[in-house]
From Swiss-Prot:
InterPro entries referenced in this protein's UniProt entry, alphabetically: PEBP, PEBP-like_sf, YbhB_YbcL/LppC-like
Record-given protein name: Uncharacterized protein YxkA
Entries under SUPFAM superfamilies matching the protein: PEBP-like
SS bond list: none
Superkingdom field: Bacteria
Gene this protein is translated from: yxkA
Length: 168
């Protein structure tokens, strides 16, 4: 399985810290980047994804979750730009770290959708992982990352990750 995201070498400004203000909510970028998929294993029914900043550990003490999504149809080939908000019919989305006490948001459009990179201290590498699954997962909107991992057990046919850079 392969995933492709345009980055040269950084994620485009529109999806990260330097997004135009019209693409920000509570100061954070909300337009999700397009993701292309190919070589999805036969037998895959859905895809799930995580977009996590492990470089945040020295800053806040834990890996920062920017986006989680599940039940993406395995046949789609691409999750289009801004799908997190404009194509919610393609997925169910989980809670990100902007709901934590460090960020303190309670706006569902911030905490239950893509909320892009805003590295505070240096360039960060963000890990996008996509999972091919043999089932639709039993999750509710706003699920937690641990619930996603628990539901995926026994259903992962393939997984792949890429690192995407965002500039300070």
């Amino acid at each position: 399985m392969n995933i492709y995201v345009e980055a040269n070498p950084y994620l485009h400004d529109k999806y990260s810290k330097y997004a135009d203000e019209k693409y920000k909510r509570e100061g954070n970028p909300f337009v999700s980047f397009p993701i292309h998929f190919d070589d999805i294993p036969s037998g895959a029914k859905t895809l799930a994804l995580t977009f996590i900043d492990h470089d945040a550990i020295p800053v806040c003490g834990f890996s920062w979750i920017h986006w989680t999504a599940a039940n993406i149809p395995a046949y789609i080939g691409e999750l289009p730009e801004h799908a997190s908000e404009e194509r919610q019919d393609l997925m169910i989305q989980g809670q990100n770290s902007f709901a934590s006490p460090l960020a303190g948001s309670n706006d569902p459009k911030v905490i239950h959708q893509y909320c892009g990179p805003t590295p505070p201290d240096k360039d960060h590498a963000y890990t996008l992982t996509v999972y091919a699954l043999d089932a639709e997962l039993n999750l509710q909107p706003g699920f937690y990352l641990n619930e996603l991992y628990q539901e995926m057990k026994e259903h992962i046919l393939a997984e792949t990750s890429i690192e995407l850079l965002a500039r300070v």
